[in-house]
Amino acid sequence: MNYSIVMFPSKPFQDTANGYRRRYDAHYANIPPHITLKERFSIAEEERSKIIKALRTIGQTHKPIAIDVYKVDTFYPQSTTIYYKIKENDRLLALYEALHRDPFPRKRAHPVFVPHITIAQGLPQSEHADIVGQLKMIDVSHQETIDRFQLLKQLDNGSWAVYETFLLEGD
């Protein structure tokens, strides 16, 4: 089975992101706006309980995370993905790193962690240039504290569903 680990921002901020995703993201219907902490990984059913136990421990030892969304950016030329960029911070990076150690699969989809919330992807290059130009003119300033993260499971239709939620309860 395929799994992923994410954090969801508040519903009002998801609504803001979805305003763009509806138009510019082909994956809009598959998953709400989120911060990916661990890209898709596969584990056997018998390994799942070990992973869940590790996630509970991580939740108990990590504090809630303040996020600061401060601009629109793009991964161009690697891809035409456009996203809300989140300022890196020690707590977010520590949580990300904890999810890339044993017992989790260590493979990283990208060499560098860029905290973000995708608002557009899979755009043709010509359309990307126009859209990113417009979106970069928008003043973006959003702060919130997120006190939980989710283990998602990929369903047969390609969409993602929350399998379990873990509170960030560290001291």
UniProtKB/Swiss-Prot annotation:
Instruction: Provide this UniProt record's keywords sorted from A to Z.
Output: Hydrolase
Note one Pfam family from the annotation: 2_5_RNA_ligase2
Disulfide bond entries: none
User: Which catalytic residues are annotated?
Assistant: H34, H116
Query: What Gene3D superfamilies does its record include?
Result: Cyclic phosphodiesterase (3.90.1140.10)
Q: Where is this motif: HXTX 1?
A: 34-37
Q: Name one GO molecular function term.
A: hydrolase activity, acting on ester bonds
In the Enzyme Commission scheme, what number(s) does this protein have?
3.1.-.-
The source's domain of life comes to: Bacteria
Q: What class of enzyme is it?
A: hydrolase
Tell me yes or no: is Repeat among this UniProt entry's keywords.
no
Q: Motif HXTX 2: list the residue ranges.
A: 116-119
NCBIfam families on file: PRK13679.1 (NF010223)
Name the family: Belongs to the 2H phosphoesterase superfamily. YjcG family.
Q: What is this protein called?
A: Putative phosphoesterase ABC1741
Organism listed in the record:
Shouchella clausii (strain KSM-K16)
